[in-house]
Every structure is written in structure tokens, then in C-alpha cells.
Amino acid sequence: MTKQTLTQLEQHDLFLRRHIGPDSSQQQEMLNYVGAESLDDLTAQIVPESIRLSQELSIGDSCGEAEGIAYIRGLAKQNQVFKSYIGMGYYGTQVPNVILRNVLENPGWYTAYTPYQPEIAQGRLEAILNFQQVSMDLTGLDLASASLLDEATAAAEAMALAKRVSKAKKANIFFVADDVFPQTLDVVKTRAECFGFEVVVGPASEAVNHELFGALFQYSNRFGQITDFTDLFAELRAKNVIVTVAADIMSLVLLKSPGSMGADVVFGSAQRFGVPMGFGGPHAAFFVARDEHKRSMPGRIIGVSKDTRGNRALRMAMQTREQHIRREKANSNICTAQILLANMASFYAVFHGPQGLKTIASRINRFADILAAGLQAKGVSLVNNTWFDTISIKGLDVAAVNARALAAEMNLRFDADGIVGVSLDETTIRTDIDALFEVILGAGHGLDVAALDAQIVAQGSQSIPASLVREDAILSHPTFNRYQSETEMMRYIKRLESKDLALNYSMISLGSCTMKLNAAVEMIPVSWPEFANMHPFCPLDQAKGYTQLIEELSSWLVNVTGYDAVCIQPNSGAQGEYAGLLAIRKYHESRGEAHRNICLIPQSAHGTNPASAQLAGMQVVVTACDKQGNVDLEDLKAKAAEVAENLSCIMITYPSTHGVYEETVREICNIVHQHGGQVYLDGANMNAQVGLTSPGFIGADVSHLNLHKTFAIPHGGGGPGMGPIGVKAHLAPFVAGHVVVKPGRESDNNGAVSAAPYGSAGILPISWMYIKLLGSKGLKKSTQTALLNANYVMKKLSEHYPVLFRGRNDRVAHECIIDLRPIKEASGVTEMDIAKRLNDYGFHAPTMSFPVAGTLMIEPTESESKVELDRFIDAMVSIRAEIAKVEAGEWPADNNPLHNAPHTMADIMDSAFDSRPYSREVAVFPSAAVRTNKFWPTVNRIDDVYGDRNLFCACVPLSDYE
């Protein structure tokens, strides 16, 4: 009979023990090795006493998985999922189950990282390339990005691109047609204010009356009207105006492409291609432009290159445009995008194929025709006389219609001017039209859907003018015409998945990325219809479950960060930075100090920081770091004093980007505050703070939190992410608001930074579950274990590689940096060689050349077991032995396992391999662990230079299949 208590048998800490990799005996063994008695002792050795919290978090106790699921199920049931006809960029969709199960709910897809290591990411790179092809085909333009965050932020990016490339250099006006979605205009205005642009809003036809650098039009507009802009666009382009268009992706299946009308840039949401509404996100935006604007495109772009064997290989193209390289001169601060959702949308297009998409789009349009015909037959007046899916109605008794709609559990769109809008979608069926007739007309309307349909078939539909009917073929590439059976689709998805290395195969030790476990129990609620199928603009009393979840999560984040308020809206870390800096900017303006526009940034900062500062209209001044990588206090004091009159803020990361807790962080905060500035603390490394210290306690004023790092939202192969910001009380009135949804906060009337009021709300249940299951003690122990794992790896590797930075007591924080520059000097072996060789050992490489060129930054999260850590350490030790053979001349510098890595099946089958000075076994089975669980890269090292010099960013030509 066991002597355990009932409390012990209930195992409330079971999730904690499953989330943390090393078990108690392994932890003790590791503690003994690093020279600490306990996790608390190790914490005391690492974290400066001056910033250590004296009290535990007040989140509550941990709970079991079943208990957590039951609680969040209760929240979900509080949501009332009405049939939505609101539209405005968010629509019901049918997620094909083959995609739901094999992509959205598959860790092989959702736990991968951004494909910086393309040799082990060919699967999702192909899926993203398909997304780009879909985007180009439907818009009629030349080059597409891999995705942006949402339609509204894509509009802001389009405005910025227009200013960069327009030949109307003296113009400072961006025109926005007055019939765009209101949330799009909201986000554009917010961004324009930072850039100093003037936004003029008016009827589309009036655009030619202004001196513009760019203009934005909606196709179809928010009332559903479809307009042929060909002549207007020609007139604008003749005046050097960059024409941008927000377009509906489903409508483009049937409509003439904006590119063929003369648009320069076309963007929109891909949500209705098989991605749930999710109360606002996450969704991928598409962004497509003319080839001449390619160097000014925001976001990532996938291109076709070749590997060392001359085979086709995919990679991220033109990376020199991005923020991590160009910093404040970058086109955008975009880092995380929406790759998982872009992949879902691309698979949706592949699964349905061009004919299937035409059938879906035609069905939606037919239902809109039937609805319009029935209403007009009863004397109802329509605002629009053309449409794809949206009917706008005037002259109704709005209160009566709304009452009947709510009674029928449906949401219509009610504009302030009395117009009632109805947007139909893929989920619409015949009985929905009957129900809409009853809601709009009242009972006894006498209309018959079948009869109306027969009438339309006989007379022909006039809803899409003949001049606007698409005549060119779409999606003619074989990929979109092969996989319409579920068997073939399932195998295609699996074939791509098998080319990629994700967390479900091995540890991904990327520094500054926190690739921790995304537990299955955390992911389960995401696809529940109560969370997945809610429209972000539905009445808030229908979203009580979401509201409570967001309030609880926000209160927990307030507790964790030491701030006073949280804004959930930013839908990426980069957006969080932008939102936080905007709050600082607005705060200074409220005090009559709008001239404060200088942002101090240490030279070691991530490139997103200066890019975000530039986006917020600030001027960047770089401060020096000392030889230990710390902020140089004397230089900071001098710079702060020099720019004191105009100092807006400083952006710092903590622990610092070089992986240590700087002892002087409070002094840094004090220096900036003394000169009238605010402190922005980048939350990228929050995984080393939770439960031990906090930004608010340290002295910062605002931070963003990467929920896709610290709080367990998966990286999705390059998104989604969430970047909510925490702020001190004095900044709370200046966080983002929203033009459509106003929950009654002081910040309601502020400009938005994202399309939806709560950002990518659909993935918030993941972080809610993570915090709920771990509780106060579990969160702290997770942080402490992350420190233990990092110091264990650091000490083991320090016997073979120099460790570049260490903090107090010779410790690191949650990551360590090994210096490969001496190795490169002695042997010619580069950090790239080591990164690619790790692929042969079954590992994704650590972060390369950040924050110091010629280094690797390693972050082993708390979720990795000692067994996996040792396997990684053994691989690095083995690689060091291989380097020694190059140093000794045993292997030539240009023909060795590192230089030739990664190795593929094709390599070892090639008879020419015999000429290499190492064996096939050394090439592909360099360790015993690999023999039992081999990951095979499918391409050799990719030629980056060739890919950029021969830019090709679409599916390979048909001739490649002949």
C-alpha cells in the first residue's frame, strides 16, 4: 500500500513534470556538474540580487491537464457562435479535414522554425512557394511575399512601399478611398502619422484631384460594389502615383485581376482559403507587387535556387532587405509573419484546384444573386448594383431587423448610416437564404430559393459585369491539378512534412528564439468551433468566454511582467515593439513634448529594434557596448546627456542579447529616466525572467511579450506569433485602440496597429493553457530549468569551444554564445559549415552570427531532457574533432564533411563519392544516435548568391515536369 497522500496521488504537478525535460535525478546530476546545490542556489549565482523578486508570482497553483481542459471548455461554452454575415474581411470557411488534421494539428508543421536553414525546410518552403503562386495568379502581378500579418497591416506596408518607390518625390499625400474596410483605414492612419504622411479620404474618383505618392482602393468595396478601375488607375499612374489595392482572395477566382487593371500592389487576407476566423486571427495576408518594386517589398520571399549538385532548391530570397541586416534602413520591421496559415491557405488551393475554387466562388456568388433577387422582388432597395458576395441594403427598420437577426442567432453588419450589410461565404447553404429572407423581410415573405435560382439561370446573372469577369486561367501549374483526392492530398502533405526538421524530431537550440515544447493539451482548444468560428466584430456579449479568457490572461501577464496593464492587440513581436513605441510617442505628445523623437539602441540589439523605432517615426542613436557585451554606461551617459532635450526612449533587451544578466540594468533605466526618456525592454528573452525578476520591477516602462517564445505558442515555421505589450500605468491610456470594437477602455479611441481588436485571438488559448497548467511555481521552475540547461550546455562545450560572454560567477542566463572565429582563422571552417554539419547529426543549427559575427548562440529551453542535451553536446564535440582533422591537414579545407555538409541520400549513392577523403559512414552516420533515427536532408547546400542573382519566386515551369 502506498504511503503517498491523496494530494500527491492527484498529481497536480504532472504537466510541469512533463513540460520540463530533465527529471529530478537528471536535474541533480546537472546541478552537481555545474556546481550548484539546487535550482534556487543556481538562480542566486546567476541573477543579480538587486533585481531578484522577493515574492512568488500570484497566478495560482498548477493543475492537471483534464482540469485545465475542463476549465477552458467552460469558457468556450460561454461563447455564442452565431451565424456570421458581418464580412469586412472575415468570413466563414470550411477547413478541409485533411488539412485540419495533417497541418494545423500536426507538430511536424506547427513546431518548425522560420526556414533560415533551407536544406532542412524544403517541405514548407514548397508550400509557401505555392502560396506565392496562388497570390500571383489571382492578383495578376509578378512577385509575392511569403505572407504578412493581416490585411490592414499589409495596407500600411503598401503605403510605405508606395512612398519608397514613387517618382512623385515631393508628394506627401496618401489617398484612401472612403469605401475601404474601416479597420484598414484605422491602421493606415496610425502608420501614416508616424511617417508624417497626410491621409486624404474620399470617393475613389476624387483621387486624381490630389498630388499623391500613392492611393488605396478596395476591390470589392465594403458595401460589396465591384468597380472597374482600369481608366482611373491609368490616369493615376500617369501622374506617378503608386496604385495599391486591397482585394478579396475568393472573389479574385471569378473577377478580373487588379494587376490587369494597372495596380502596382495588391494585398488582402487569405483567411477565407480554409483558415478559421478565430475572433480575428491568426490569418496570412498576401502581398503582391510588380517586379520593378521587388527590392522594396516587405516581408519574406521564397525563391528558387540550386544546391551544390545543381538540383532545384528553395530558400528565402533577398534577405538583405530584412530588418536583421538593414536595421533602421529595412523596408519593414516584419520578422514573424503567418507561415502556418499561409501554408493552410496554399494547401486549400492545392486540394480544391482551380475548378474546385471556381465552384466554391460561383456558389457564393449565386447565393448572393438569389438573396438580392428575392429582396428586390419585394421592393427592398440595394446600395450596390454589382457584387461578388456582399449585399448592402438601405431603407430597412434597422432595430426590427437586428432583433429578428439576434433571435435567429445570426449577425448582420449594421453601419452607422442605417445600411444593413450581408456577406455570404463558403459555409452558406440554402436554408441560410431562407432564414435571411425571414430576418430581413419578416415571416410570410413567400420567396422560394429554387425558383429564384431557376430565374437567374434562365436570365443570366448581372452581379459581375462582363468587363470584370476573369478570362485568364489560374493555377495551371501541375501542383494545383494533382491532389484533389484526399489520399493524394494526405500523401502530398506528408511528403513535404518529411523534408523538414521540426521540434517533433529533435531539439532546436536557436538562441533568442525559445523553441520550447508546444504541448498537445495547449493546442487542443484552438480548433474548437467556439474559439475558431467567432467573428472579431461580433457583439461582445456573444464573446463572454473569449472576454474572460483575455482578461484572465492579461491579468496573469500583468503579474508576470510587473506592469499595470496589457494590450493584447499586436499580432507579432515586431508589432509589439511598434505598439510600445507608439505608446511612448503618444505619452510625450500628451505632455507637450512631441519633439522627443530620439531612441537610444545598444549596438548589440536585434535588428527589429531599430527597424521598429524608424517605423514609429523615431531617430535611432546607437550606444556602445563594452568588451563583455554590456551596455557601456559612460557612453550611454554621454549620449543621453547629449540628446536629453529630444530623448524619447531607450530599447534594451534583458537578459541582454549576449545571454547574461547585466548588473547595471537598473542604472541604465535611471540614466534614461533622469533625461526625460522612457525605457522599452524587449521581451525576447522573457523566458529567463518569469518568476525570477520582471521588467516592471527592473524599472522599465513598456515591453512586448513574445507569446510564441516564452508562453508556448508554436512558431509555425515562421508564424503565427503574438506580441502583446505590458505598460506602466502612465502609458496605459496610449496603447492601441480600434475603430470597430470599443470595450470601454481609456485607449478605445486610439489608432489600431492590427486589423483585429485582440490581434490573433484564436491562439491565445495556448498561452492561457500554458500558464494555467504550470501555475506560479511551475512558471518559476521552468525559468530555473532553462537556466540550468543553458549553463550545463555552456560548461560542457566550454571544454571544446571558447564561450564569448559570461556573467556573474562565470554563468550565463538562458543561452550561451560560442566563438568560432579562432576556428575559422585556424582551419577555414566557418559557422555556416558547422551549422550545415549539424543537419547531418539530426539537428537544426543554433542562431548564427548574432549578436556577434562568427558565433553560434545556443538556447536549450527547459523542455529538453538531459539525454537530448547530451546528444547535442556529443554532436558539437564530434564536430570539433572533425575540425581538428582539417586543422591538422588530414582533410583538405575544401573537401571535408563540414565543407560538403549537409549530405543527402544522393551523395552516398553517387560513385563519385569514393574520391572524397572520408567515408560514406562519416558523412551520413556520424554518431550512433543518428543510426537509429536518421533525418535525411533532401538537398545539398544551397547557393544563396545564385538564387538572388537569378531571382525566381514562383512554382517551377511546366517544362520541368515534361
From Swiss-Prot:
E.C. code: 1.4.4.2
Reactions the enzyme catalyzes: N(6)-[(R)-lipoyl]-L-lysyl-[glycine-cleavage complex H protein] + glycine + H(+) = N(6)-[(R)-S(8)-aminomethyldihydrolipoyl]-L-lysyl-[glycine-cleavage complex H protein] + CO2
Class in the EC hierarchy, top level: oxidoreductase
CDD domains the UniProt entry points to: GDC-P
Oligomeric and partner information: The glycine cleavage system is composed of four proteins: P, T, L and H.
Family to which this protein belongs: Belongs to the GcvP family.
Name used for this protein in its record: Glycine dehydrogenase (decarboxylating)
The species this protein was found in: Shewanella oneidensis (strain ATCC 700550 / JCM 31522 / CIP 106686 / LMG 19005 / NCIMB 14063 / MR-1)
Gene behind this protein: gcvP
